[in-house]
Amino acid sequence: MPTALFAWRRTPPPFLIGGAEVTQQLLAEELAAAGWRTVYLGSHQAPWDRAPQLTQVRTFLDEHDTAYEESQEELRYRWNGMDCIAVPQQKITSVLQRLLARVRPDVVFTSQEGAADIAAQARPSALVAGILHSVSKTGLGVLTGRPHHGLAVSQFVLRRAPRTDGTRLSVLYPPFTLPEPGQRRRERTNAVLMVNPIPAKGADLLHQLIRRMPEQRFTLVEGWWNTTEEFASYPNVTYVPRVYDMSPLYRSHRLLLVPSTVEDAFPRVIIEAALHGTPSIGTDRGGIPEALGNTGIVLSAKAGAEEWAEALRAADHHTLGKEARQRATAFTRPRLPDLERLGIYPAANAPST
């Protein structure tokens, strides 16, 4: 039985912050479902400020009737076929060394904060794949640890990734899942949706758009941090706290807005919304046009509120939604064939060394 080890400095599943967590959890779950032994090492402290999260982790597991073992600040539990381990930041290196020796993984997946050190530590013992979730220093930093593979989540990221000796760069699009049967049946309102309304994601333009279109309902979903106070004065805005299951929101809105000012790698929300028949309007920044394909509306990053308002009014969300759903379905195929094509799956099927 092949063994995969996911090791990083963020929380292990099922605790989500953004797209990187979702992408890796779905990939790990696919490997586990295919018969791999899948181990997921993370931390119960945030890597950016070491804020403690252990209490929240315990509470969540208790609420979901998930048994766990706790010893010497290590928390172990099973989630969707994965063996999950959450430890303090200062123990990641020592626990990783122990896992490399005892579990003897065939492949180690790592990414984000501190991933270069993890890749360098694991490289002598196993095949190492660094997942490139963005073109930021955090997203591309794993490459300095010289992983055997650098898996870019889009062609855009692949083009921006620096070439590194000993690292093969390839595209591995994020995994997605089809909506549950019956989820598509929900009345769609005239409201439009935006996730993570912060400055980098286009909040300034959003404020202008909300004021320019008082007749249009906007639903905003909390993302990286709570910005509800910034939008509290608008009568045409509904602000929703962060939710794990976005399906009801996708199904009940006619458009998703992606007015990012930064170079997003490959926004998961575009594909997720499309799987529910909700098309998107986005800027031409980063990997947004790649995620939209020819089934959404792409506006220049320099476009103002009036141009966005015109696009909202003119969008044929019925036709665009059907086309978007059809295209997005292709992203729900298994990722194991891609790993096989890259030489990762055969390596995992070979005897461990």
Q: Residue spans of the language-model regions?
A:
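Conserved catalytic-core segment of nucleotide-activated headgroup transferases in glycan assembly
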Residues: 178-233, 239
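Acidic donor-binding loop of glycosyltransferase active sites
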Residues: 251-265, 278
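Short glycine-rich donor-binding/catalytic loop of glycosyltransferases
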Residues: 261, 278, 282-289, 301-303
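A charged, aromatic-enriched C-terminal amphipathic alpha-helix characteristic of glycosyltransferases
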Residues: 303, 316-345
